[in-house]
Amino acid sequence: AGSPKLASSEDFLSGDWKDIKAQEIRGIRSNMLFFDLLRKCDEYDFVFFDMGPSLGAINRAILLACDYFITPMSSDLFSILALENIGLSLSEWKMTFNKVLANLNSEDREGLEGMKQECTIKFLGYIYQQYITKTSDGNKRIVNAYETILRQLPAKIKENLAEKINCDFSGKQNYELGSVPNFYSLIPMSQSAHKPVFALTNVDGVVGAHYQKVKEYSDIIDTIVNAIYNN
C-alpha cells in the first residue's frame, strides 16, 4: 500500500533532521517513525518498502530503520554515478544517527523503548533492468554501449556500497541478485489489477503469449528470492 500524499511529510522530516544533530528528542522521535512502524509489524516475517529514486528525508528515515536495502540498476551512466551519492549519503546518515543515539541521556532513551537503538542497515544486492536487445536471424544480439556500462557495475557496487556500507573489502560476495527483462503490457496490467505479475490470470486480461511471460516472470522472481536468501 502507498500514497503520493506521503510526500507532504518531506519538509517536516527534513526540518527535524536538524534537531537530530542538536540531540533534540523531538527530531529523533519523528525521524524514527519507520522504526515505530516496524515495531508494530512483528507478526510479519518481512516488511518491504518500495522507495522512489531520491535521497530525500522520507527515504532517509526509511533506510535508517531497515535491516537491508536492495537497489535497482539500469544499463545507463546515471545509475553508475548515483552509486557514489548513495554510498556517501547513507554512510553519513548512519554515522550521525548512531552517534546521537549513543549519546542520549537515560530519560530520553526510555522514550525510545522497544525500538532499535542504532541503525544497522546493510547493502543486500542489486537487480538490473535488462536493455531491449536487437534481434538478427531470430537471435538476440548484445549492444556494446549497454554492455560497457554493465561491466562496470560489480566494481562500482563494491567500491561505493559493499565497502562503504557493509565494510566488505573481500570482493568475494556476489551482490548481483538477478536481472529483469521488459515485460511490456504485463506491468500496467498488474498495476490495474492490484496484483503481482505472477498472479495475473485471464480475468485480468492475460491472453495467448501473456501466459508464458507470466510464467517467465514467476521463474525470475524465484531466482531473485533465492539469491536474497543466500546473501
Where are each of the predicted segments found?
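C-terminal lobe/tail of nucleotide-utilizing enzymes
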Residues: L104-N231
